[in-house]
Amino acid sequence: PALYGLIFTVGAGAALAGALSAAKIGARIGQGNTVIAALLLSAVASFGFPIAAMIGDESALPIVIAAGSLIGFSSLVFNITQVSARQALCPEHLLGRMNASIRFFVWGVMPISALLAGAFATWFGLAPVLFVGAIGAVLACWFIFASPLRGMKNIVAEGR
């Protein structure tokens, strides 16, 4: 139990650091590049979990902490940057519908994904399923990397 507390405490600290630095990162490398870099960092960091699962004991703890911290940091940077841009670009009278639609599609697949991942991990083993998930996360980055976001300094100004 103490190790779980350590993992989540360090990850929460990294997430807080991401929240506090999102605006500065966006100002330095541009909001579009921030969204892409944060998403890619999170995807690459997710490879730490299948590696830790393959190790299979407490010696994998630093890998789990590092992966969780990188994902916590980058997830907050990503979410703050993209949600702020979405809300600034969306007409005010459509904000509720836009946010509800995003939440429905993003959060709506999570229970289905968790159920399928659990079933696949039971059938094929934890590490292979985590590797497939990490590969999927990296491949999903291609869509956003190929989008007009790349190079945008200010998503709101350039997106209108």
Can you name each region flagged by the protein language model?
Residues 1-160:
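C-terminal transmembrane bundle of multi-pass solute transporters/carriers
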